[in-house]
A protein has these predicted regions:
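Conserved alpha/beta cores of soluble small-molecule-handling proteins
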Residues: 1-135
Length: 135
């Protein structure tokens, strides 16, 4: 289980972190996520995952202002804080917090970035996965 996560601009203890009840990701699944595996602090296909994250955010018209370099810095800090050598990085960007309403057009909503590091004892890259369709 992760110890330190990054949520809405702050590093926080996993047990103390909270998601606002009016987060659109909570109500409507109005969010994008990516999972990146790392082994000995080397990321598996980092650029492709980040490119897909940004493409998905753009497709959903989520106005995300973080740069790739700032995301990578946060991720590296979390890996160090959690003393993880092998594991996965879960990145989620929700549209943000607003009153419960199906429409988000015309609202000034700040996206919420959450990053969680999950430590693993071993990752077998030869395990057969499943097919998925991505944007």
């Amino acid at each position: 289980m992760p110890n330190i996560i990054y949520i809405d601009g702050k590093y926080s203890n996993y047990e103390d972190s909270k998601i606002h009840v009016n987060d659109r990701g909570y109500h409507f699944g109005d969010a994008v996520y990516e999972v990146i595996v790392f082994n000995k602090k080397i990321f598996y296909d980092f650029d492709s995952h980040i490119e897909r994250l940004f493409n998905s955010l753009k497709s959903l018209e989520i106005n995300f202002s973080f740069s790739i370099s700032s995301l990578k810095l946060i991720i590296k800090n979390l890996i160090k804080m959690n003393r993880a050598n092998i594991g996965s990085v879960y990145i989620q960007v929700s549209r943000g917090i607003s009153e419960r309403n199906h429409s988000y057009y015309g609202l000034n909503i700040k996206p919420i970035l959450t990053i969680i590091i999950t430590k693993k004892s071993n990752i077998d890259i030869n395990v057969k996965g499943v097919r998925a369709i991505t944007l």
